[in-house]
Swiss-Prot record:
Protein name: Mediator of RNA polymerase II transcription subunit 28
Native source organism of the sequence: Mus musculus
Homology family: Belongs to the Mediator complex subunit 28 family.
Gene Ontology CC terms, in alphabetical order: core mediator complex; cortical actin cytoskeleton; cytoskeleton; mediator complex; membrane; nucleoplasm; nucleus
Pfam families in the record: Med28 (PF11594)
Gene: Med28
Renumbered residue ranges of the record's region Disordered: 1-43
Coiled-coil ranges (or none): 109-145
A molecular function GO annotation: actin binding
């Protein structure tokens, strides 16, 4: 499958050292094309991983802790991050090309995936609507309970003095201190 890429990433600087041997069953989906300047058993994913690790290694490097120039530290970190971003773009490009090939070779598969994504989005939104409806019903019930409580005082005596007496009856008495 990777051989069909035929020099897709030519002109790229040599990658990091290959991963340690002895990783059986490792996917070679992103294996570099013949003639590319990568090590023979390195893949885009391996390079992405090693460049990510190099970003962290440059941040915690003992060389930087021992009083190296700030500009030198910044330059080293920027280079590591730029390399990581370049390899990430290459990896994204690879997957976009595979997606394009799939859409050309099997357009019905792409439509099925789109329909599946739309269905899952509808289910997610339906669940969100149900959640909001539940909250709405709860608050409607709270408001209804408040309205019922305010309608009950109609049988109480009218007037400002009666209202103050009723309001003060609901205030707890102060505790006596000894």
């Amino acid at each position: 499958m990777a051989a069909s890429l035929g020099g897709m990433f030519t002109g790229q600087p040599p990658g990091p050292p290959p991963p340690p041997p002895g990783l059986p069953g490792q996917a070679s989906l992103l294996q570099a094309a013949p003639g590319a300047p990568r090590p023979s058993n390195s893949t885009l994913v391996d390079e992405l991983e090693s460049s990510f690790e190099a970003c962290f290694a440059s941040l915690v490097s003992q060389d930087y802790v021992n009083g190296t120039d700030q500009e030198e530290i910044r330059t080293g970190v920027d280079q590591c991050i730029q390399k990581f971003l370049d390899i990430a773009r290459q990896t994204e490009c690879f997957f976009l090309q595979k997606r394009l090939q799939l859409s050309v070779q099997k357009p019905d598969q792409v439509i099925k995936e789109d329909v599946s994504e739309l269905r899952s989005e509808l289910q997610r939104k339906d669940a969100l609507v149900q959640k909001h409806l539940t909250k709405l019903r709860h608050w409607q019930q709270v408001l209804e309970d408040i309205n019922v409580q305010h309608k009950k005082p109609a049988d109480m005596p009218q007037g400002s003095l009666a209202f103050l007496e009723q309001a003060s009856a609901n205030i707890p008495a102060p505790l006596k201190q000894t």
